[in-house]
């Protein structure tokens, strides 16, 4: 998957004037130009620096708790760190954002902001159903898998709220194919982009090794 793969979610033909509509894409691409092991080691070396942040802790609905790098996401921006793989990732995100924006709107985007953080998860951790934004200026969000072992990120239709989260998790773990969600296997080097309002969660991390991802928000300017 060296090219961008677009997974399209669109409503069926409306039978009622009050039926909901949706039309969005989940975009994915495998990046072979990032050394994930080197990046993993670098991020782990920065963990204590991030943990030194003690104010404004908020895990943003992920369920990971305040003793995490995730809960400090509002107090640091990973893309200000000068490291070769992060610098490459910034360029790849910019390229993918431009491609996505052009595909959906037919126009180029001239400028956008980028803020990111790292999620370092231990055995037994799971990111709960949440989204990143739904305001009138919300734009795109994404994640990059640095190191993972048999986990999935699941992107849920924002109108599909009839199924409880624990049921959804079991459906995904049992391999149930349901059109209300898209289950994406977390592969080292995978970059994913999606509208910020899309609810998403992960399956449980069952490995003794860390699960490490970089999550980010793009700001429309």
Identify the meaning behind each predicted range.
Residues 72, 77-152:
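Conserved double-stranded beta-helix
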Residues 154, 217-221:
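Double-stranded beta-helix
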Residues 199-213:
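Ligand-binding loop in jelly-roll beta-barrel domains
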